[in-house]
Amino acid sequence: LVKEKAQQNNLPIECFETDALEGPPFPSHDVIICSLFLHHLDNNEAITLMKRMAKAARVAILINDLERSWLNWNMVWVASHLLSRSPVVHMDGPRSVAGAFNQSEVLELAKKAGLINVKVETRWPCRYLLSWVK
């Protein structure tokens, strides 16, 4: 869908699928984006992913993910129960927030990945945006 929309608007975009942790090196691009994936990784895997993204990015990396906090967990619990009757949704949403990193943790992981001058901002709903510019 993204590729189709970009082509309709004459925007150059390349999407690729790969093993994020052990696959071949990422192709070089101006910006490498990771969205709602980091919370599925442990600390070492997150560091590996950030290193691989930084190596491939010519300009910047962006990581948008869930932020673990008491408030976010409760908001997701309420929203999942109000908006869905699925027991999978009721369990998956809060569990994903519980498994996510908080902002100080993701900053520390970025530091361990060798990223300097990382910026982390709160984003709605229940997320943060980590940005690093080379």
What is each stretch, according to the model?
Residues L1-G23:
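Class I SAM-dependent methyltransferase SAM/SAH-binding core
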Residues P12-E14, D30, V118:
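Short, conserved active-site loop motifs that form the nucleotide-linked donor/cofactor pocket
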Residues E22-P27, N43:
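Short conserved loop adjoining the S-adenosyl-L-methionine
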Residues I33-C34:
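A conserved beta-strand element that flanks and buttresses the S-adenosyl-L-methionine
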Residues L66-K119:
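C-terminal alpha-helical "lid/dimerization" subdomain adjacent to the S-adenosyl-L-methionine
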Residues Y128-K134:
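C-terminal lobe and adjacent flexible extensions of AdoMet/dcAdoMet transferase-like proteins
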